[in-house]
């Protein structure tokens, strides 16, 4: 109901963003409350998404056994539980972090639940693009919980994780093609075909690789992060290019691209948490508490 895999992935990225900004000076209470608060917000969004998607979930093999589809738990109960999680999560962020971190969490939540889940996912091929923003919010929340401002580092993180979401999501859409087609969800492989989807995967990975390199180039991380970025990005890009081989098994290839995406973003989150650099940066935006 609350998608623990998604929560775990966001936990890793928010921790990476937090430790990147903390630069070795960690406020343990702030870190734990940021992680807990954001995890509850993400869980809330996932629960509301399940309520909204119950009609299309019933048409998909992967999701037809969700409790909101089977009726094991009433939609009303899931709705109340999800809203309660969100209220507690936002409350923790409001009490322990700052206005910038809270603002990003609120915007990400509204984009995911209000714009993506309610409309874009069902009606537009650009739904994945809109959803990528909300998926990129957790590391920025972690980062801004420490800094209290939007600086170049925060912008790079937002771009980096937004770009990562695209090939990651397209890979899922390819190996779950039958499910998305059955539910008439206009993801890129269904709406525009596999050739277009493969091209977009390669292009997004290439741009993601360049943007990831901006963290060390801008002085936020060191040579170790750059090495991890180059190694994982080239590996991921190489796997994506295999999609153009003759007689390729698209489902197997897409699962490999998906697996590479998980390894890549996990490695980068760990690397930026450990290979931080001290940077004097002029904030782009600051909200006074």
Swiss-Prot record:
Its UniProt entry gives the catalysed reaction(s) as: heme b + (2E,6E)-farnesyl diphosphate + H2O = Fe(II)-heme o + diphosphate
Domain of life assignment: Bacteria
UniProt keywords, alphabetically: Cell inner membrane, Cell membrane, Heme biosynthesis, Membrane, Transferase, Transmembrane, Transmembrane helix
Which InterPro entries does this entry report, sorted A to Z? Protohaem_IX_farnesylTrfase, UbiA_prenyltransferase, UbiA_prenylTrfase_CS, UbiA_sf
Q: Where are the transmembrane segments?
A: 1-21, 28-48, 76-96, 100-120, 125-145, 155-175, 199-219, 221-241, 260-280
Q: What is its EC number?
A: 2.5.1.141
Task: Extract the Pfam families matched here.
Answer: UbiA
Indicate where this protein resides in the cell.
Answer: Cell inner membrane
**Can you cite an annotated GO cellular component?**
plasma membrane
The GO biological-process annotations, alphabetized, read as: heme O biosynthetic process
Q: How does it sit in the membrane?
A: Multi-pass membrane protein
**Which pairs are disulfide-linked?**
none
Give the Gene Ontology MF terms in alphabetical order. Answer: protoheme IX farnesyltransferase activity
* Pathway the protein contributes to: Porphyrin-containing compound metabolism; heme O biosynthesis; heme O from protoheme: step 1/1
Gene3D superfamilies membership: UbiA prenyltransferase (1.10.357.140)
Q: What does this protein do?
A: Converts heme B (protoheme IX) to heme O by substitution of the vinyl group on carbon 2 of heme B porphyrin ring with a hydroxyethyl farnesyl side group.
Identify its protein family. Answer: Belongs to the UbiA prenyltransferase family. Protoheme IX farnesyltransferase subfamily.
Q: What else does the entry mention about this protein?
A: Carbon 2 of the heme B porphyrin ring is defined according to the Fischer nomenclature.
> HAMAP family, per this entry?
CyoE_CtaB (MF_00154)
The name under which this protein is listed is: Protoheme IX farnesyltransferase 2
Q: Which species is this UniProt entry from?
A: Shewanella woodyi (strain ATCC 51908 / MS32)
What gene is behind this protein?
A: cyoE2
């Amino acid at each position: 109901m609350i998608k623990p895999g998604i929560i775990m992935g966001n936990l890793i990225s928010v921790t990476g963003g937090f430790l990147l900004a903390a630069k070795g000076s960690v406020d343990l209470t702030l870190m734990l409350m940021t992680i807990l608060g954001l995890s509850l917000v993400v869980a809330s969004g996932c629960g509301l998404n399940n309520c909204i998607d119950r009609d299309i979930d019933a048409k998909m093999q992967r999701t037809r056994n969700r409790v909101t589809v089977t009726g094991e738990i009433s939609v009303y109960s899931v709705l109340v539980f999800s809203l309660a999680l969100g209220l507690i999560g936002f409350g923790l962020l409001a009490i322990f972090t700052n206005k910038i971190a809270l603002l990003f969490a609120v915007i990400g939540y509204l984009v995911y639940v209000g714009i993506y889940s309610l409309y874009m996912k069902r009606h537009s091929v650009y739904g994945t693009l809109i959803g990528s923003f909300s998926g990129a919010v957790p590391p920025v929340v972690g980062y801004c919980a420490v800094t209290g401002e939007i600086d170049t580092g925060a912008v790079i993180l937002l771009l980096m994780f937004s770009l990562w979401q695209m090939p990651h999501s397209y890979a899922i859409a390819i190996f779950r093609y039958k499910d998305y087609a059955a539910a008439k969800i206009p993801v890129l492989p269904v709406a525009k075909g596999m050739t277009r989807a493969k091209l977009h995967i390669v292009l997004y990975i290439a741009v993601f690789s360049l943007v990831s390199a901006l963290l060390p180039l801008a002085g936020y991380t060191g040579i170790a992060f750059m090495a991890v970025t180059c190694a994982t990005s080239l590996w991921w890009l190489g796997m994506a290019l295999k999609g153009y081989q003759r007689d390729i098994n698209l489902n197997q290839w897409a699962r490999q691209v998906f697996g590479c995406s998980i390894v890549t973003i996990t490695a980068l989150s760990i690397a930026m948490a450990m290979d931080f650099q001290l940077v004097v940066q002029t904030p782009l935006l600051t909200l006074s508490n």
